[in-house]
Amino acid sequence: MRPQQAPVSGKVFIQRDYSSGTRCQFQTKFPAELENRIDRQQFEETVRTLNNLYAEAEKLGGQSYLEGCLACLTAYTIFLCMETHYEKVLKKVSKYIQEQNEKIYAPQGLLLTDPIERGLRVIEITIYEDRGVSSGR
């Protein structure tokens, strides 16, 4: 759900956090641009949930090994008729972001963009101009 009528006033980019290596996780530091727009705890919870989902996607387990073996045995044609564990979790991420946008972010004039659309490099948050509320600028 996107606030269609309001013009874009800016964008905030939440960068990847490489402090624990190259696994996909994002910084939970609250950006100053979102002050008075969304609750700090709600923002941090959203990013933590996304980080947990990406950790689940990258987790190696029996299913991942089985997928790899089946891929080798079928010259990777198995993936034409089967979703990988990673793809299933990415769908969960997309659904979670859509729910967060509808329930929390869009009513506040914000829009989360799925990190997969930005190559898993950043979480983009679009800020729409306040509708009838002074932004203090």
UniProtKB/Swiss-Prot annotation:
Lipidated positions per record (S-palmitoyl cysteine): C69, C72
Modifications the protein undergoes after translation, according to the UniProt entry: Palmitoylated on Cys-69 and Cys-72; which is required for Golgi localization and interaction with GOLGA3.
GO terms for cellular component: Golgi membrane; Golgi stack; palmitoyltransferase complex
Membrane topology: Lipid-anchor
Keywords: Golgi apparatus, Lipoprotein, Membrane, Palmitate
Purpose: May be involved in protein transport from Golgi to cell surface. The ZDHHC9-GOLGA7 complex is a palmitoyltransferase specific for HRAS and NRAS.
Name under which the protein is recorded: Golgin subfamily A member 7
Organism per entry: Mus musculus (Mouse)
